[in-house]
Each structure stands twice: as C-alpha cells, then as structure tokens.
A protein has these predicted regions:
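Short, well-structured N-terminal submotif of metal-dependent ribonuclease cores
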Residues: 1-36, 49-62, 129-130, 141
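A general alpha-helix detector
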Residues: 8-9, 43-44, 81
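Structured helix-beta-strand junction loops
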Residues: 29-31, 67, 92
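Active-site neighborhoods of divalent-metal-dependent phosphate/nucleic-acid chemistry enzymes
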Residues: 71-118
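Acidic, PIN/NYN-like endoribonuclease modules and their adjacent C-terminal/linker elements
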Residues: 102, 108-141
Length: 141
C-alpha cells in the first residue's frame, strides 16, 4: 500500500514527466492499493487537466472507477490532526493536501508510512505519529 501525493501522481499520469516510466513500473509492481487524499485528488485533477489534457484526466477517472486507486475519507479526527500538524510545522506552510497525506501515512488506518512523492522538503521534515520516518518513493527505493 502506498499513500500518494500530487507530485508522484503527476509523474505517473503525465506522459511528459521524465520520471513517469519508472514511477509507472514501480506502481504496476505494487501489490497493495494506492491511497489518495481527497485534497490531493482535487489538486492533482486540476494540475493533470491543465498540464496533460482531457485524455490523462479520463485515465485517472477510469482508474478511480475501477478501484485502482482508493480515495480516503477526511474525518473530523483527521481535521484535528491536520490542525496540530499545520501548527507544529507552521514554518513549512504544509497545506491541507500535504497534512492529510501525512496523517494517512502516519495513522493506523492503512498501516503504512510509504508515500509516493517528490516533495522532499515537507515529507522529510515531518515525523510519523508512531515515530521513525516516512518512506518516500521513489527516493528511498
């Protein structure tokens, strides 16, 4: 199982991204689900449509319809955790998309600290709730 950030998804879906083939190969080999925050999904959809066009967006929507990707639910408990993260790491200006992605990877809900992202700045600075560090893909392969 991998929690996905916008930058990693863009590499996977945008044919113009140089990292795309390696990311797609890694994701195709992944046995577990890909989990996406609804905030990441909204951010990603906008960027994908404006950068790669309608065909790329249709691929995303068809993947979502066939359960290739799982869209996580944002709960009131997540909102409280996000507020604490944003406050604790105020200097990073995390935003809700990154904060919720970190919560999904740090909570027991999905049992993973693996995140598909190229955002080293935010995801290296923040520590999972259970301690340790996030495993950032593809950097930590």
């Amino acid at each position: 199982m991998i929690i996905c950030d916008t930058s990693g998804l863009l590499a996977a879906y945008d044919a113009e991204e140089p990292e795309g083939p390696a990311i797609r190969q890694m994701l195709n080999a992944e046995a577990g689900a890909l989990v996406v925050s609804p905030f990441v999904l909204a951010e990603f959809d906008y960027m994908l449509l404006t950068r790669a066009g309608v065909r790329a967006e249709l691929t995303l929507l068809n993947d979502l319809a066939s359960d290739v990707d799982h869209v996580a639910v944002f709960t009131s408990q997540d909102a409280g955790r996000a507020a604490r993260l944003v406050e604790q790491y105020a200097d990073l200006k995390l935003g809700i998309a990154d904060a919720h992605t970190m919560i999904l990877a740090a909570a027991d809900r999905y049992g993973t600290t693996r995140i598909l992202t190229f955002d080293q700045k935010h995801f290296r600075a923040v520590k999972p709730l259970q301690g340790g560090v996030f495993t950032l893909l593809p950097a930590d392969l």
